C-alpha cells in the first residue's frame, strides 16, 4: 500500500444524510475513437462530522478506512461556499 493519501476535489450534490455528504467529482476522458474529450462524473459518499457542508459547496476530501458499506472518504476542508 502506498504512503500517499488520495485527495480529491468535487462539488457537494446532497447533504440530506446525517454526517454524510455526496460529492460529485468531474473528470475529462478522451473518447477512444473520436478523440473528443467527454465529461464523466463519479459520485462518492464522504463523512462530514460537523454537518457543515451545503449543496453546491466545493470541498476537498481524502480517502480513509471504511466507515460504512459505501463510505470510505472524509471531508478535509470546504474550499468555497455555494
UniProtKB/Swiss-Prot annotation:
The keyword rRNA-binding applies. Keywords: Ribonucleoprotein, Ribosomal protein, RNA-binding, rRNA-binding. One of its GO terms (molecular function) is rRNA binding. PROSITE patterns: RIBOSOMAL_S17. The keyword Transport does not apply. Pfam families: Ribosomal_S17 (PF00366). GO terms for cellular component: cytosolic small ribosomal subunit. Gene3D superfamilies: Nucleic acid-binding proteins (2.40.50.140). InterPro entries: NA-bd_OB-fold, Ribosomal_uS17, Ribosomal_uS17_bact/chlr, Ribosomal_uS17_CS. GO terms for biological process: translation. Part of the 30S ribosomal subunit. One of the primary rRNA binding proteins, it binds specifically to the 5'-end of 16S ribosomal RNA. Belongs to the universal ribosomal protein uS17 family. This is Small ribosomal subunit protein uS17. The gene is rpsQ.
Amino acid at each position: 500500500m502506498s504512503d500517499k493519501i488520495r485527495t480529491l476535489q468535487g462539488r457537494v450534490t446532497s447533504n440530506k444524510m446525517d454526517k454524510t455528504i455526496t460529492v460529485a467529482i468531474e473528470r475529462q476522458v478522451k473518447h477512444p475513437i473520436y478523440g473528443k474529450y467527454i465529461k464523466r462524473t463519479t459520485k462518492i459518499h464522504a463523512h462530514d462530522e460537523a454537518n457543515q457542508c451545503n449543496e453546491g459547496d466545493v470541498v476537498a476530501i481524502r480517502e480513509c478506512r471504511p466507515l460504512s458499506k459505501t463510505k470510505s472518504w472524509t471531508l478535509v476542508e470546504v474550499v468555497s461556499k455555494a
